[in-house]
Amino acid sequence: MSTSAADTLSRPSVRPAGRAVDALRPFSLERGFTRYAEGSVLVRAGNTHVLCTASVLEKVPPFLKGRGEGWVTAEYGMLPRATHTRGDREAARGKQSGRTQEIQRLIGRSLRAVFDLRLLGERTLHLDCDVLQADGGTRCASITGAWVAAADAVALLMQRGDLAHNPIRDAVAAVSVGLVDGRAVLDLDYQEDSACAADVNVVMTGSGAFVEVQGTGEGATFTRGELDTMLGLAEGGIAQLVRAQREALQ
């Protein structure tokens, strides 16, 4: 049964942390967290903490050589004890998991959506997103933090005179939404994510355009009305995240 946004927001909260259904977890962006990267940000979304660094490489992948444009790409990983039990480093296993590959491709796609790669010149902006502590929403936090790290790296390039124009056309941020106990909720933590009937990750630009929507039923189905309600919550949450990004850069 579909639920209107108004009905969803008017009922009392049933969330473990007592949050309203449209409330983000406490969110912060700490810039300049590491010394050497051209851009670095520690993003905290509740108990999810991700270190995002942006490195400038004066080269491009072979398929872009001689074309006069740059590239933005990403890698993603989790520290062995980012979760309740220790996991082996993927380097020790000798291969990345399918999940890791999917997430880092998502981060790269999301950042490229708001870059004019021609203005970047023949260089690569390489984003590394390392999860220090995971409590749900790590890919969304990575995208939101990586954009700020990228903005700092671009600002440094412009300050050095390496770029004449800013290649970043817009902000980009991401948030999760889902159906928990029959209700649409924003910014799921691990407890909610483990129990949800539907899980949707939404990536949007600062101007309100969708970059990507990843949605799945978790042993259940959801209606078009429920999807619309979840997307409405995501739009509101991402607007708040974009404001936080812009405030962090001031």
Swiss-Prot record:
InterPro entries: ExoRNase_PH_dom1 (IPR001247), ExoRNase_PH_dom2 (IPR015847), ExoRNase_PH_dom2_sf (IPR036345), PNPase/RNase_PH_dom_sf (IPR027408), Ribosomal_Su5_D2-typ_SF (IPR020568), RNase_PH (IPR050080), RNase_PH_bac-type (IPR002381), RNase_PH_CS (IPR018336)
Any GO molecular function: 3'-5'-RNA exonuclease activity
Keyword Secreted belongs to the record: no
Keywords of the record: Nucleotidyltransferase, RNA-binding, rRNA processing, Transferase, tRNA processing, tRNA-binding
Pfam (any one): RNase_PH_C
Its EC number(s): 2.7.7.56
Record: residues binding phosphate: 99, 137-139
Catalytic activity: tRNA(n+1) + phosphate = tRNA(n) + a ribonucleoside 5'-diphosphate
Recorded superkingdom: Bacteria
GO biological process, one term: rRNA catabolic process
Keyword hit for Phosphoprotein: no
PROSITE patterns reported in the protein's UniProt record: RIBONUCLEASE_PH
Family from the record: Belongs to the RNase PH family.
Function: Phosphorolytic 3'-5' exoribonuclease that plays an important role in tRNA 3'-end maturation. Removes nucleotide residues following the 3'-CCA terminus of tRNAs; can also add nucleotides to the ends of RNA molecules by using nucleoside diphosphates as substrates, but this may not be physiologically important. Probably plays a role in initiation of 16S rRNA degradation (leading to ribosome degradation) during starvation.
Assembly description: Homohexameric ring arranged as a trimer of dimers.
Record HAMAP family: RNase_PH (MF_00564)
Record's protein name: Ribonuclease PH
Gene: rph
